[in-house]
Amino acid sequence: MTSEHVPQIAHLETLCFHDPWSEKSIASELENALSLWLVAVEGDDVIGYVGSQTVLGWSDMMNVAVHPDHRRKGVGESLVIALEEALKAQESTCLTLEVRGSNDPARTLYEKLGFAEVGRRKNYYRNPKEDALIMRKEWVL
C-alpha cells in the first residue's frame, strides 16, 4: 500500500463495512512498522486490500475487503494467500482474524484457506451488534 492508495481504500471501506475506517486511520498504518498492507489493483483502481499487524511473530489480520463488483472472482483469496506468504517471509508463525458470525462467505473462505475457529468475542461488532468469531491459522517456518 502507498499513500496514493489511501483514498480508494477509504472509499472501499464505506462500501464494505458498517463501521468504516477513516482515511486518517488508514494513512497512519503507512507509518506503523508493525503493519503490512497489500492491495489488489485493476488498472489504476484498488479493487481489494488486506491489512495486518505483527507483534513477536504473531500476526493479526485487521481488515480485508473486496469491491462489490469484484467479489467471487478470487481477489479476496489471492490477497489472503499473498498476505500469508509475506508474513512467513517476515518470520510470523500464525495469522489470527475476527469475522462476523453472520459473514458466511468470509468464514467459508477462511476455512478453505485452513483457518479454524478458536474463540468468540461477545458483542464485538456494532451496527448491528454481533459476536466476532476468532479464527487462526498456524504454520511452521
PLM-predicted stretches and their roles:
Residues 67, 71, 100-102, 127:
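Residue-level recognition of the GNAT/N-acetyltransferase active site
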Residues 3-69, 80-86, 90, 138-141:
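Acetyl-CoA-dependent GNAT
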Residues 72-86, 104-113:
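Conserved acetyl-CoA-binding loop-helix of GNAT-fold acetyltransferases
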Residues 111-120, 141:
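Conserved acetyl-CoA-binding loop of GNAT-fold acetyltransferases
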Residues 87-98, 121:
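Conserved GNAT acetyl-CoA-binding A-motif
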Residues 98, 116-132:
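Conserved catalytic-core motifs of GNAT/GCN5-like acyltransferases
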